[in-house]
Structure formats: structure tokens, C-alpha cells
From Swiss-Prot:
This is Putrescine importer PuuP. One of its GO terms (cellular component) is plasma membrane. InterPro entries: AA-permease/SLC12A_dom (IPR004841), APC_superfamily (IPR050367). Involved in the uptake of putrescine. Imports putrescine for its utilization as an energy source in the absence of glucose. The chain crosses the membrane at residues 27-47, 54-74, 100-120, 125-145, 162-182, 204-224, 242-262, 275-295, 344-364, 365-385, 399-419, 422-442.
């Protein structure tokens, strides 16, 4: 049956495209902003208790596992240098139906992360200025995120570079103060100690359990793939950016947690280990440093908010260009700013829901989508290279396209086992809604709309 709807939308030279302007360092900074480096302080008390004082060992183990998935992303972006991330990879490596469900599930993560950052900003600023109504902070913060993302992705990248450097600077000062404290007899009393990695109290199972928690700190390194169509030579630049984002993020997490663990060998000093950040800053640097440190956490949310707002706008753009969502709205690119302007505004409207959500419910929304994306990216490598392209003849092929994605998938499987029941329930409800919408698309078009772009893949050698 003939259908007039644009199921396979050919690239149209006259259409406004996203502006290709990002450099490698800008993409990496966007990725680090998405990771929010200072989250290491939020989880330290919890993970230190679970791992018996070996938080950096848990981060090291988590980084090793995450890198397998990062490598899978790198392989796929060379083949499909487009902005859809896991949605595009599953769509083209497995089939459009699976791709749609992966994209729909990923939206749960991408769409609500800007709102969570707005919610955190509201919490921080309301604590500092209790006389100001919370809605003022929500509206102001959303306006800033939306305006910056409307104007230019370069503007967002430059802001994020500044904000990430501010976070790293305050962490360097923190480490300096820790070293001073260690020389004065605090903690283990010396910088030259491997106790945070290995000691008589180190046991593999507690460290692995800690790793399953800190692994969630790495969620978002894949968001840089949504910037592929705004990065010249994306097939070569984006794989580097993915790997560097994961590695640099891991180095920051490991370094910060190492010095913290030397200063706090156990959690006995914390009144509330589950929310130890204010106490950590107070014990290490005093009241003034604590105030500065807490202000920097606001910068943390601003950086992550800008990056996540940009990422979800690009994912919606690709799904709109595919006509999975109405192309006239979601596939629109502003002719002057060269940004997906309507998507940016819609994400801003969703972020206003921070007025009504609490933090526990909001955070439960995001992990499901990220794990779906990670799982199917690893499966896509296997299906595209090993199965479909027949790259299964040599031991090298088996290593790159079977063993490595399998290890990546197993690592993600550990995270699935440790996913909170609330996240799983909300995720399954969201996936059910996506399944119903997919059924509607199939009934209407007889197949899922698919973009037939003009991107040329780079051979995997």
C-alpha cells in the first residue's frame, strides 16, 4: 500500500542543518559537565561505608567496566556519525522497532535530567535564600538554560568549559587542604599510602558492591554522541571524545576519592554518611571553605543542566527528522541560530515540572533509560559487525566484536541487578507507553519512519 508520508526522509540540501562548529575539547567539556565531577562528594559517605573504606578502588573497578561500553559507542559512531546516539545505533544495527524503543526509553533519562538539575538548584538556593519563593529559582534557572541553548551550542560549550574548570579548581584546592591536614596528623597521617586501594580490610565483594553504586556517576558520558552533527569530522572526533570523557571523569573521581579516603579512613566522623558533603568540606577546610564549596555545587547543577538540555534537544531533533515525532515541530532548526529551537523550548517547559517533583521521585526516573541505552549499544556492536557484516573470521574479530561488547553488556547487567525497584517500575510503565505509540506508528505507516541520511560511515579497521 502506497503511503504519502515521508517514511524514508532523504537528506535535503536546502533544509537548515545544525551548525558544525564544535571542537574536540568543547565536546569533552560538555561530556564532563554532564557527568558532574563533584558528585563524587555526594556519594562518598555511602560508598565508603559499603566498601569498608575503599571508595577509589570501587571507582577504578567501575571505570574499567564503563570503558567497554565507551569503546562500543566509539565503534558505532564511526559507522553512524549522527546525533541520535543509542537510538540511531540500535535502529540501524538491529532494526527500526528496537531503535524506537531504545530511543523512547533513553528519553526518560535525557528528558528529565535538566529538570533534576533545576530541582537541585532550587533546593540549594532556597536553603541559602529562604525568603525567596522557590518558584522564582525554578523559573530563573530554566530561563537561563533555555536561552543559552537557543542561542548557540558553542555558547553552551564555552559556558560549560568555564563551569567545569571552576569545579576542578575547587577540587584542587580541596586536595591541597587535605594534604595539609594529613601532614598535621589527620586521617591516616600520610599522603604516601595505598590504603584506599588495598589494605587488610579490603574485600572484593564490598568493593564490587561499591562499584555498582559509583557506576551511576558515569551515566551521561555517552551524551556527547548527540553532538555528532555539530562536530566537524564527527566519525573521528566523537569516539575520542567519548573515551576521553569517561577516562577524565574516572581520573577526577578516583583522585578526589583517594584523598578523601586518606582524610576519612572510615565514616565514624560523619553524623549523616548518606549526606556527607557539607561535613567533608567543613572538616577539611573550615566554615568559609564549606560555604564556597557548597556554592560550587550550584555551578555543578548549572553545567549539567546546560549539557543535558542540549543533549535531549538533539535526540528529539533526530526522532523528529525521522518523523517518529512530528517532523515539522521536532525536526525544526532555527535558520539563524542553527539550533533545534522548538525542542529547546519544550525541554525548558518540561524542566518547569521541578516545581512539583521531589528529588527521590525525580532521580528514580533517569537510570532506567541510561541502562537501556548502554545495553543496546553493546548488542548493536555485536549485531552490526560480528553478525551482519560477518566480521567473525579471526581471533581479533572475536575479541573486538564479540568479547568486548559482551563484557560491556555484562557490566551493564550488574547495574540492572542493582537498579532500584522504583526506577524499574517507572521505566517499564514508560516503555509500555512507548510500545503503544510504536503500535500506532506501525498501524499508520505500516513501518517505523526511518531517516536515510547522507552521512558516510568510516570503515572499522
Amino acid at each position: 500500500m502506497a503511503i504519502n508520508s515521508p517514511l524514508n526522509i532523504a537528506a535535503q540540501p536546502g533544509k537548515t542543518r545544525l551548525r558544525k562548529s564544535l571542537k574536540l575539547w568543547q565536546v569533552v567539556m560538555m561530556g564532563l559537565a554532564y557527568l558532574t565531577p563533584m558528585t563524587v562528594f555526594d556519594t562518598f559517605g555511602i560508598v565508603s561505608g559499603i566498601s569498608d573504606g575503599h571508595v577509589p578502588a570501587s571507582y577504578l573497578l567501575a571505570l574499567a567496566g564503563v570503558l567497554f561500553t565507551a569503546i562500543s559507542y566509539g565503534k558505532l559512531v564511526r559507522q553512524f556519525p549522527e546525533a541520535g546516539s543509542a537510538y540511531t545505533y540500535a535502529q540501524k544495527s538491529i532494526n527500526p522497532h528496537v531503535g524506537f524503543m531504545v530511543g523512547w526509553s533513553s528519553l526518560l533519562d535525557y528528558l528529565f535530567l535538566p529538570m533534576i538539575n533545576v530541582l537541585l538548584a532550587k533546593i540549594y538556593l532556597s536553603a541559602l535564600f529562604p525568603e525567596v519563593p522557590p518558584w522564582v529559582w525554578v523559573v530563573t534557572f530554566v530561563a537561563i538554560l533555555t536561552a543559552a541553548n537557543l542561542k548557540s551550542v558553542n555558547l553552551v560549550a564555552n559556558f560549560n568549559t568555564l563551569f567545569v574548570l571552576v569545579q576542578i579548581s575547587i577540587m584542587v584546592v580541596f586536595i591541597f587542604l587535605v594534604v595539609q591536614g594529613l601532614h598535621k596528623g589527620e586521617g591516616v597521617g600520610t599522603v604516601w599510602s595505598l590504603q584506599p586501594f588495598i589494605s587488610e580490610n579490603a574485600h572484593l565483594i564490598p568493593i564490587i558492591t561499591g562499584a555498582t553504586i559509583v557506576c551511576f556517576s558515569f551515566l551521561g558520558f555517552d551524551a556527547v554522541t548527540t553532538l555528532s552533527e555539530e562536530t566537524p569530522d564527527a566519525a573521528r572526533v566523537i569516539p575520542k571524545a567519548i573515551f576521553l570523557t569517561a577516562v577524565y571523569g574516572g581520573v577526577i573521581f578516583i583522585a578526589a576519592s583517594f584523598f578523601m579516603q586518606l582524610f576519612f579512613p572510615d565514616i565514624s566522623r560523619f553524623k549523616d554518611p548518606d549526606a556527607a558533603l557539607p561535613e567533608i568540606a567543613l572538616y577539611v577546610g573550615g566554615k568559609l571553605f564549606q560555604s564556597i564549596f557548597l556554592c560550587t555545587t550550584f555551578v555543578n547543577t548549572l553545567a549539567s543542566g546546560l549539557a543535558s538540555h542540549a543533549s535531549v534537544s538533539r535526540l528529539l531533533y533526530v526522532m523528529g527528522r525521522d518523523n517518529v515525532f512530528p517532523e515539522r515541530v521536532f525536526g525544526y532548526v532555527h535558520p539563524k541560530w542553527r539550533t533545534p529551537a522548538l525542542n529547546v523550548i519544550m525541554v525548558g517547559i518540561v524542566a518547569l515540572s521541578a516545581l512539583f517533583f521531589d528529588l527521590v521521585t525525580a532521580t528514580a526516573l533517569i537510570n532506567f533509560g541510561a541502562l537501556v541505552a548502554f545495553t543496546f549499544v553493546n548488542l548493536s556492536v555485536f549485531n552490526h559487525f560480528w553478525r551482519r557484516k560477518g566480521m567473525n573470521k579471526s581471533w581479533k574479530d572475536h575479541f573486538h566484536y564479540l568479547l568486548m561488547p559482551l563484557v560491556g553488556a555484562l557490566t551493564v547487567g550488574v547495574l540492572w541487578v542493582n537498579l532500584e525497584s522504583t526506577s524499574l517500575t517507572l521505566g517499564l510503565v514508560w516503555a509500555s507507553l512507548g510500545g503503544a505509540y510504536l503500535w500506532y506508528l506501525i498501524r499508520r505507516y505500516r513501518k517505523v519512519p526511518l531517516y536515510d541520511g547522507d552521512r558516510t560511515p568510516v570503515s572499522e579497521t
